[in-house]
Amino acid sequence: IMAARQVWSTPKEMRTGLVTLGRRALLRAAEHQGQLEQVEEELFRLSRLLLKQPELSLLLDDQSADPVAKRDLLAKVLYGKVTAVTEALALQVIGRPERNAIDDVNALSEYAAALRGHKVAVVTSANALTKAQHQTLATKLEGIYAYPMSLHTEVDPSLIGGAIIRVGYEVIDGSTSGKIARLRAQLV
């Protein structure tokens, strides 16, 4: 009914609008089930899995590959590891891609955060953050950005120490490896 009331310029615009409405409905269902934060985190983790598994990502993005086979493969990867909403959203991304699997899944994670009134900060640290560090960082970022923050964390030992924080296109590099690189650049 909602889609019928909309004004669509092209069939492609209508398709995109319907896909967006379907994704929003699934996220609202997760919200009503009290699972929206979990779905957001699962989608983020899936985007990171796809980044770390380029063969899987390339296969899922391959327009010439059988769509049913791609969905079956992803369903096997996700089965029993994520909520039903996360699985449905991920399978829909593969069936109706807008850009590529990684970007589409990541965009859904950010959209889930936005539905909760949050901005996303991706925090890559040399070691896993403690709960206290997580809370302190979230509070500081909320002060900077004037929004509640969803912290999506990942560990990268190559940073040696510290962390890199990404909020949208802004990057705050407080990592030891980043500081060393900046010092090297100054010496040259």
Regions found by a protein language model. Name each.
Residues 1-164, 170, 175-188:
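Elongated, mostly alpha-helical coiled-coil "stalk/stator" tethers of large membrane protein machines
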